[in-house]
């Protein structure tokens, strides 16, 4: 049930957060606190509901640009920027964990990071997580962006960036918008080509994660590397 604007202005979600913790609030209520006020004919909690519905939940909101958010009627630049900043902070918490932890020992963390980075994308993107000798994240970089069904990946560019960042290993990830997370024959062939190119400069390809919405698949776990 959504709250009337006067009750929201009185701080009901805020008071509950202070007394019982943020975990007691629903997703729309948490968004309402970031938005602070609603728009014409829609209080802040209702606006939170609308955002989640329009973008397919928190996963869909993650990584949404201010311009995309402003498509929502009444959502101006200020609200869109605040919301985009909050969502980007959420994404960066996963990146911070990868900087501190061994990626090989934390496959679930890697999959969650890749899903957060790619699960909401409408066209194919490929990213590379460049890792140091302790398998901690140095940097995550986009290496390809394509269409709904494909992204052109150049192994030489991935190798060049690995050398530039002094990486000892890396993890690739790409998304299948609107499809399944299963590796295609082309995915397998390209992955093996990249692995061979990296091996020439003593850089190890640890995994290639495929993302389709909320689903992720490890090509290493499936024996495709």
UniProtKB/Swiss-Prot annotation:
A motif (JAMM motif) lies at residues 174-187. The keyword Zinc applies. GO terms for molecular function: metal ion binding; metallopeptidase activity. Residues 103-225 form the MPN domain. It holds the Pfam family UPF0758_N. It comes from Bordetella parapertussis (strain 12822 / ATCC BAA-587 / NCTC 13253). Keywords: Hydrolase, Metal-binding, Metalloprotease, Protease, Zinc. The keyword Hydrolase applies. GO terms for biological process: proteolysis. Zn(2+) binds at residues 174, 176, 187. This is UPF0758 protein BPP1850. InterPro entries: MPN (IPR037518), RadC_JAB (IPR025657), RuvA_2-like (IPR010994), UPF0758 (IPR001405), UPF0758_N (IPR046778). Belongs to the UPF0758 family.
